[in-house]
Amino acid sequence: MRSDMIKKGFDKAPHRSLLKATGLKDEDFDKPFIAICNSFIEIIPGHKHLNEFGKLVKEAVRAAGMVPFEFNTIGVDDGIAMGHIGMRYSLPSREIIADSVETVVNAHWFDGMICIPNCDKITPGMMMAALRINIPTVFVSGGPMAAGKTSKGEVVDLSSVFEGVGAYQSGKISEEELKDIEDHGCPSCGSCSGMFTANSMNCLCEVLGLALPGNGSILAIDPRREELIKQAAEKLKILIERDIKPRDIVTEEAIDDAFALDMAMGGSTNTVLHTLALAQEAGLDYDMNRIDAVSRRVPHLCKVSPASNWHMEDIDRAGGISAILKEMSRKEGVLHLDRITATGQTLRENIAEAEIKDKEVIHSLENPHSEEGGLRILKGNLAKDGAVIKSGATEVKRFEGPCVIFNSQDEALAGIMLGKVKKGDVVVIRYEGPRGGPGMPEMLAPTSAIAGMGLGAEVALLTDGRFSGASRGISVGHISPEAAAGGMIALLEQGDIVCIDVEERLLEVRVSDEELEKRKKEWKRPEPKVKTGWLGRYAQMVTSANTGAVLKIPHFD
């Protein structure tokens, strides 16, 4: 066993003595040591209940004849961190999470790991660590929260609350109505109820094969979550016995399938960023061109909030992720069905009994929302290395208009609230990329303000930052290269005409090459916004969005 490094031989007597101080007995040294990587934190509703989950996981691991050791990672609630300096820490927290898991697991030579994530950066951070460490691992997430209902019976979620702010600002609703939405938007523990980043990543974790069937859609408060926990411990023991590791599971084909589900569900644009980072950790050469190829062959089968009024509980009721995959498998060339997963079985075996139970929620191949996926990669002179749009969350497929330029999210939000943006404008928020932000903050507050003011289909928004999974409308993010790296978005000037063509996958500014070259020669890189601390180091080391915004390792001569 891997853990023999710290428990076998006369020279490990000090190690065993320390372990006995934690409560271990001599007989425990013949059992696998299992890391329980939890992310319990009280300020995040998606993680508030994970302390109890950790206890259940440890019980299940002991029942399976193994020895559990629980530890916790940090976490950032993107909703609470939204709209202020806290959002700069969100994406960088992914790297701290991955590094902290790597540190604990490799320092103590565990034989296997069960990860308990749930929200936005915690799930991909743990997945990155699992691929880096490469010991048998199973994920069991905290699960989605249910959607809420206002006193009038209106179904609401966190997206409704953000958009309610814009609606109140523009006089469309009263303060009492906003308070009603606020009070009911997040009714329980769990990850926010729509197809936002947290749920998108937990669904993708299931498809990749690191989590068990049901992981993506079973609600946090559903008793079936406890059964999933028991299964996770049992399956982990099988993975250890068969020496099946994350890099055996997360192959190029598995990533294809993850993006295929993402396209079928119109998931968060953040999945592109995180899954590219996973590919980096797995040592795979996977780029945005391959994502675009997946998008072209996968139909959009279900729309979940913010693209519709359906929520994760509806997906679960309609058959869950397995039902979507089963329907997708009817189209040749969409899925790789014979690859291994954390169940110890193939994807084909995992979904064999699944079926769609509500075709209003999950559409059939014969009746898709669109013939192509709900996410698309755009390129052009504004995004040489690519940009991402959640095409399934807007009915507008072509938009052209003059730029209204802001050099930060705060500046943009203030401008929107002051009425500086009007119908037909293209709002540009730049210097908010991985390096420029730093931390590539999400633009949920500006997009929600635009939508809440009734301009969602009348105004486009471009950024080198990110969008929350709760964002909708004509929102193009992840523009690469970013402004701080001298990308074309830095060269835009007020009033430049920008064209967004979703069908042609095009993002262009109507300015001549000669003029752009002239502007490039005159451009000067702004001073970094942060020069000290973690964010200062992050800004110096982070790579572009099109490579997952991972950290580059400095090379020394």
UniProtKB/Swiss-Prot annotation:
Protein function: Functions in the biosynthesis of branched-chain amino acids. Catalyzes the dehydration of (2R,3R)-2,3-dihydroxy-3-methylpentanoate (2,3-dihydroxy-3-methylvalerate) into 2-oxo-3-methylpentanoate (2-oxo-3-methylvalerate) and of (2R)-2,3-dihydroxy-3-methylbutanoate (2,3-dihydroxyisovalerate) into 2-oxo-3-methylbutanoate (2-oxoisovalerate), the penultimate precursor to L-isoleucine and L-valine, respectively.
GO biological process terms, semicolon-separated: isoleucine biosynthetic process; L-valine biosynthetic process
Keyword Transmembrane helix: no
Residues modified to N6-carboxylysine: 121
Binding-site positions, Mg(2+): 78, 120-121, 442
Species of provenance: Bacillus cereus (strain ATCC 14579 / DSM 31 / CCUG 7414 / JCM 2152 / NBRC 15305 / NCIMB 9373 / NCTC 2599 / NRRL B-3711)
Known pathway: Amino-acid biosynthesis; L-isoleucine biosynthesis; L-isoleucine from 2-oxobutanoate: step 3/4; Amino-acid biosynthesis; L-valine biosynthesis; L-valine from pyruvate: step 3/4
Obligatory cofactor(s): [2Fe-2S] cluster; Mg(2+)
Cofactor detail note: Binds 1 [2Fe-2S] cluster per subunit. This cluster acts as a Lewis acid cofactor.
Similarity comment text for this entry: Belongs to the IlvD/Edd family.
Annotated GO CC locations: cytosol
Transmembrane segments: none
Active site: 468
Catalytic class of the enzyme: lyase
One function term, GO molecular function aspect: hydro-lyase activity
Catalytic activity: (2R)-2,3-dihydroxy-3-methylbutanoate = 3-methyl-2-oxobutanoate + H2O; (2R,3R)-2,3-dihydroxy-3-methylpentanoate = (S)-3-methyl-2-oxopentanoate + H2O
Listed name of the protein: Dihydroxy-acid dehydratase
Self-association state and partner proteins as the record states: Homodimer.
UniProt binding sites for [2Fe-2S] cluster: 119, 192
Sorted UniProt keywords: 2Fe-2S, Amino-acid biosynthesis, Branched-chain amino acid biosynthesis, Iron, Iron-sulfur, Lyase, Magnesium, Metal-binding
EC number: 4.2.1.9
